[in-house]
Amino acid sequence: MTIFRPHLRFLFKPHFLYFQSPAGQSSRPFSTSQILRTALDMPPPPVDTTQRLAKLRELMAQNKVDVYSMQFRYTIKAPLIITVVYSFFFFLLLALKLCLRKTAISQSTLLHVMGVETLIRITAAFISSFTGSAGCAIVSMSKAALSTDGRYFSQAAKQLDSNWTLLKRGVEGVPTWEEWTAEQAENGKVVGVDPSLITAGENLHYTPLTSVVVTNCSYVIADARKLSQTLKTTGGSLVGIDQNLIDAVWGNERPARPANQITVQPVERAGKPFEEKVEDLRKELAAKKRSAMVISTLDEIAWLFNLRGSDIPYNPVFFSYAIVTPSVAELYVDESKLSPEARKHLEGKVVLKPYDSIFQASKVLAESKASASSGSSGKFLLSNKASWSLSLALGGEQNVVEVRSPITDAKAIKNEVELEGFRKCHIRDGAALIEYFAWLENALIKEGAQLDEVDGADKLFEIRKKYDLFVGNSFDTISSTGANGATIHYKPEKSTCAVIDPKAMYLCDSGGQYLDGTTDTTRTLHFGEPTEFQKKAYALVLKGHISIDNAIFPKGTTGYAIDSFARQHLWKEGLDYLHGTGHGVGSFLYAEVPLSASNVLSNEPGYYEDGNFGIRLENLVICKEVQTAHKFGDKPFLGFESITLVPFCQKLLDASLLTEAERKWVNDYHARVWEKTSPFFEKDELTTAWLKRETQPI
């Protein structure tokens, strides 16, 4: 989806996608995926939000709340990936979040940071009708505003009704959501945050309030600090609120946390025994002279212990915490979820503790400090993405050192087994996409079938299921025709999606989770006769894609520098796109990673013309060290190995718009696509013919 920006798309620290029922009351189990999909069946936007806003303001007045602000960022892909899944549960959630007494900002940097973000987005969608994956909704007694970034300008403009003002993030002259909130909360008003839903790194003054607020959305790390500083300029302040009303309001209707089974990621696919990973972490603790690390990031826990779950849609993680000391590794998880294989995997090596006991255990850890014999400073290591409440349980600043998690860095560097898994799964996934595109063209052109965007996405899933080691999609498929392709994180819904027009551009962004790796591929096709401008725009995007693929740069180069390689050709024509050129990808996990050898990243420049079409060309690449004639400063140089194997659209390829070197790149790439994928279609004449045509030299 969207490379090279130090951001948030896939590094996700989720926490509770569930709420427990009070003691003595039954809990209703639920399927996370089912809930996510149910929520997507919302009325066609825009929705008239007048009554909802009136009710919100009524509750705000009753509770003496001047401003209600809710920042959200989902983290899965597809419009988003997490970009991707969107709404549901609004009514109960909404009601709750309104019961505040002070100015309230609802965030989503939860304890784990991802699960509840989904619920927040649901609430945000309900109050604003905007279903995008990132933004901030702010409501005062007389105004309502929605701030979002360039990926969602088009979508927000379509979904917001006249009650709302769209704050286009990054556009000159448009206030940030923090500035807009400060304007509404001036003259001594208070903005409240739930300490379990904000990162520990904020070091905000903790002032418990009798009435609460908040909920979640991710990555408020810098935002909370910035908001706090901004509020001070108008006399406002930001405080921690001790209680969360969601549990109280939801009552018996609150769903239980997922009880999906946890399985083992065998060392043949993980590439390294979990015992060695734990020992590596202990060495890191010793080097930093820390007595323990408390881990709350779900993908880090799954990676560390070579375990996989399915508590978060499209992401093989499970709700848990972990504590690693020089002598003990503890996993806080619902034991009933562990498969017999997983129990045996951990037996005698990891101490299992109840999931809900993590805060009490953290308090005990803080009280005991580190043993004198350990030689440590007695402080505990905590990720700077962990919740403020977890930091407080460990004793706060005097006991905790908040840093970039060493596990994040360790898992970002894929080992050879993981890299080989990526290469192999991309061959199979490439074959699946080739089969799909061949089928789609035949159905539309030869058979004259009427297929909508969801029909296409469903067929692709059906095809992928036939290929070895397929687990499921890695995000909701973006199947978009014509103008819908211009909505960067478009999510087709059966009730409102368009019929695929063979005379228009078709953009398909999809990915699969395989036992040996994760895929993410975008191709833009045309089944009829594209315009000259469409072919030119396609060539400009392809040139940028090739520039990234051919890039060679010294180790330590920032992503921003490389991002410009992809945009340069569009810039020369006065064109651009409003998303990053790529993102990091996990190994049957999710992760946003910096540029380093053995990282797996996406290369996906694009161009979008509102109301007309969108173009995006995405391959996954492995960052690797390359040989150069010289090594300036004795630094190694890095480059990329493209592992995606799907041809580019011949009807959109105009060889005259490419240089000789670019044409050679395309021909070499297509030759490799044919070599690797054609054996899958020895008995499939339709797909073989399509693949042969699409990979012919230009």
Curated annotation (Swiss-Prot):
Annotated positions binding Mn(2+) 1: D520, E604, E618
Record has Hydrolase as a keyword: yes
GO biological process, one term: proteolysis
Alphabetically ordered keywords of this record: Aminopeptidase, Hydrolase, Manganese, Metal-binding, Metalloprotease, Protease
GO CC aspect terms: cytoplasm
Annotated GO MF terms: metal ion binding; metalloaminopeptidase activity
Pfam families in the cross-refs: Creatinase_N, Creatinase_N_2, Peptidase_M24, Peptidase_M24_C
CDD domains listed in its UniProt record: APP
Signal peptide location: none
Superkingdom as given in the UniProt entry: Eukaryota
Cofactor note: Binds 2 manganese ions per subunit.
UniProt keyword Protease, yes or no: yes
Record-listed E.C. numbers: 3.4.11.9
Reaction(s) catalysed (UniProt annotation): Release of any N-terminal amino acid, including proline, that is linked to proline, even from a dipeptide or tripeptide
Residues reported to bind Mn(2+) 2: D509, D520, E618
Named cofactor requirement(s): Mn(2+)
Primary role: Catalyzes the removal of a penultimate prolyl residue from the N-termini of peptides.
Family note: Belongs to the peptidase M24B family.
Name this protein carries in UniProt: Probable Xaa-Pro aminopeptidase P
Taxonomic lineage from the root: Eukaryota, Fungi, Dikarya, Ascomycota, Pezizomycotina
